[in-house]
């Protein structure tokens, strides 16, 4: 009878290990209740900002375990658009303290779920007030999707009338803040009240868990629908006192697409023309920023303005053209920072504390961000502390002046960022200060090698030959090669002028022909002068090729006369002084003579 007891012992131990400890329970199993929920849905920009003030109560009996955390849920329709989620609770000093939020999964339930750790475990019957902030991107959809320059922009937002929660809610209300008072339509659940640009829903009582009812509003919204589709931020750290920052930004207006043509005249004359377009925006740079530049593919953009304030540097960025719906632009902003404000060290231990992403414009949305942090050559034991989850790519190497084995580059990626992501990232690394002498020593060594090479070169004779005749032949060959190049350029001038004559015959624009003549005369004169100069050099060298070049010059003068004669014939044809048949016959004769002269010139060139 001993054997069955021995077999049951491992099973009992396993069950004891999986059993919940006294005073602990999973958040979804706790009897928590939302006593009161007040939601504010801010749709005044192109972002949807939802703030929920929740009074959470522990509705269990005195024997129930304490609640150390609770669950937050997001609707399946909005989960993919979530950019930021934060939970705060007011402390004793009335300051809002952020709570730890970790994503989790609930079997059999759709949507995203998060576990929020409370600062103090909640006893049965106790309550706590928390504030939940969420920011969604690309949830305000333009409708209609295309508008003309003079039309206003309307958008549609779809959400939930109820606070989506795994717990029952006793009472809840919702206030919707719109961008304007012009509202096309909105859902009427519970007879909402409307005042100017506000919609008030509720209170709704005794709402079951996971309740959903579609809330929809269609209203005017002309706020800037500006989106950074892609951004690359490069931070280059130098231990010589400077940190260089450069941002490559791809911008797009993600509002209603412009339908029809764009009128610059109407845009300047009528204040409400293109009301949803973007003329300019302000970027806030660090207060210590200096040597600021702003450029695009064309070059430096002079329409920007820089304002230095006490706590920041304000830069007004004005693209070369206003941005309408669907329009894109690309630009680069760069500046330098003193390293003593962001780089700290203790011996060989260094810590760089900078923002992963900085302010670009108000209510910013960044679809895709790539950050590259270039550390000094020789940095090792690199560690990155980020305030939120980022995707690290394999480290790279960057080579610049006087580098030997490359500078380590930290590469990080992040998608769907908003202003709440403007937080500091800390990079720890070790660096041997002796390596700071590497670059100065390389410069000294380079100059030493240069001076030594010059000394050797001056004192030694590296000439291959002392034959004067061979040197003279080399000089003549070099001059001949230059003559060939110049002659080919002159022939190219004649072909280009032939094209000008053809365009003149089609457009009948005398200015086109006159401009072509002037260009031909100037360039031909310059080329002929250079050939004459080379001819005199050949004569100085005593080469018999001088006579051939002289003959070629005479033939070229005849070719030029025939080319200009073709232009005169074309003018007579366009003016009606010459019949077309006669013009064709004359043109054939001129072309034949030109071809003969060009053939003679080619024979001379072959003989050179």
UniProtKB/Swiss-Prot annotation:
Q: Does the keyword Endoplasmic reticulum apply?
A: yes
Top-rank taxon: Eukaryota
Q: Which residue stretches are annotated as topological domain Lumenal?
A: 25-435
Cellular compartments per GO CC: oligosaccharyltransferase complex
The signal sequence is: 1-24
Tissue and organ distribution: Detected in liver (at protein level).
Using the UniProt entry, state the residues involved in the cross-link Glycyl lysine isopeptide (Lys-Gly) (interchain with G-Cter in SUMO2), renumbered to this chain. Answer: 539
Pathway listed: Protein modification; protein glycosylation
Query: Subcellular localization, per the record?
Result: Endoplasmic reticulum membrane
Q: How does it sit in the membrane?
A: Single-pass type I membrane protein
Q: Which UniProt keywords apply?
A: Acetylation, Endoplasmic reticulum, Glycoprotein, Isopeptide bond, Membrane, Signal, Transmembrane, Transmembrane helix, Ubl conjugation
Positions of glycan attachment: 300
Q: Which residues cross the membrane?
A: 436-456
List the Pfam families hit by this protein, alphabetically.
Ribophorin_I (PF04597)
Residue ranges, Cytoplasmic side: 457-607
Q: Which GO terms describe its biological process?
A: protein N-linked glycosylation via asparagine
Q: Sites of the modification N6-acetyllysine?
A: 188, 539
How is it modified post-translationally? Answer: Ubiquitinated by the ECS(ASB11) complex. Ufmylated by UFL1 in response to endoplasmic reticulum stress, promoting reticulophagy of endoplasmic reticulum sheets.
- UniProt function note: Subunit of the oligosaccharyl transferase (OST) complex that catalyzes the initial transfer of a defined glycan (Glc(3)Man(9)GlcNAc(2) in eukaryotes) from the lipid carrier dolichol-pyrophosphate to an asparagine residue within an Asn-X-Ser/Thr consensus motif in nascent polypeptide chains, the first step in protein N-glycosylation. N-glycosylation occurs cotranslationally and the complex associates with the Sec61 complex at the channel-forming translocon complex that mediates protein translocation across the endoplasmic reticulum (ER). All subunits are required for a maximal enzyme activity.
Describe the family membership recorded for this protein in Swiss-Prot or TrEMBL: Belongs to the OST1 family.
Q: What is this protein called?
A: Dolichyl-diphosphooligosaccharide--protein glycosyltransferase subunit 1
Organism encoding this protein: Sus scrofa (Pig)
